[in-house]
């Protein structure tokens, strides 16, 4: 299992969208220009899209997302909580938001 967090903020509308839900989809599928209304279609988005789409393709082919241009992406474990942060500068964080997740886990569980 590999964990990631998409932290890149779109420049569209003076950045008001920030890093909204599903914002990474055009980058994962390397459709930055086609979805410029979300990504801005600029160089920073394209550079990140190249990295992300390569990682997703490599994972689909081999089960391992590691690819050129990214730091080593370690598998997620409960102990380490290795998480790849996708932003202009990509990197690994460990036990990212651990305190927040501990609070969330105290919430009562309700059925759907």
Feature roles, as predicted:
Residues 1-112:
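C-terminal helix-and-tail extensions that cap enzymatic domains
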């Amino acid at each position: 299992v590999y964990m990631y967090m998409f932290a890149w903020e779109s420049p569209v509308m003076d950045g008001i969208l920030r890093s909204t839900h599903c914002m990474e989809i055009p980058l994962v599928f390397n459709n930055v220009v086609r979805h410029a209304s979300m990504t801005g279609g600029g160089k920073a988005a394209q550079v990140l899209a190249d990295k992300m789409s390569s990682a997703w393709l490599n994972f689909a082919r081999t089960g391992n997302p590691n690819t050129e241009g990214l730091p080593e992406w370690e598998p997620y474990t409960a102990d380490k909580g290795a998480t790849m942060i996708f932003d202009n500068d990509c990197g690994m964080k460990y036990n990212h938001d651990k305190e927040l997740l501990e609070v969330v886990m105290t919430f009562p569980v309700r059925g759907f």
